[in-house]
Amino acid sequence: QLTAVRQALDPANLRPRILLADTVGLGKTLEIGMILAELVRRGRGERILIVTPRHVLEQMQHEMWSRFALPFVRLDSVGIQRVRRSVPASRNPFSVFHRAIISIDTLKSDRYLNHLRKQRWDAVVIDESHNVTNKGTLNNRLADILARQTDALILASATPHNGDPKSFAELIRLLEPTAVRADGNLDEEAVRRLVIRRHRHSDEVRDVVGGRWKERLTPVNRLVAPSPAEDAVAGELSRTWLHRADDAAPPGGRKAGS
């Protein structure tokens, strides 16, 4: 994962922009977290937006907090509407929380476009970015807006190629428009700088891991009651990060007991 951090934050890159295209199982989420944590350490990660498919929202939020101590407020459409009602009409709702994680299906809505075009970010992450490559779609429109409004851009996809060279070129264009020539061909030197693509048989992976791949086990989920100390921490986090006013519900869900 250190390779990804070094490449993304290489001084030669005026803006940290990269496509993490490692195959499944090589730790793209860890690479994302390490890059973001280093940006924060350098004072370049105050405002961060993570955009993911809905089904991985909670997992991504948990990984960022548990592994890198990076708290993100998870927002859905209801939560965003609550934020809009709690701030003056002239204030951009996406300026309220400095670090947010929102599903792409929520964020691509027409109702948020004007706000997103006016909001700057230090870093934007788009997970499973192969879903934003089709020109003219709502997903692609959202990605294009965010790419223009951020300094650092991290795209992550285990399948950046879908058989159509134009799809891969679109990912590169989001990172660096000048890397796609007028004839549609790519600047190969720029691609090498912008893309990390490894699989289990890559030399770097083989040198580190060898053949020591463990078989994946089926996860077993058990419901465990929290301790009083854990309840206290959860309450403090909820009051500090989620509640905007007394008796307000968390932006992403209902009030406790409702």
PLM feature spans:
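P-loop (Walker A) phosphate-binding loop of NTP-binding proteins
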Residues: 23, 53, 159
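Conserved G/P- and acidic residue-centered "switch" motifs that form tight phosphate/ATP-binding loops
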Residues: 25, 127, 157
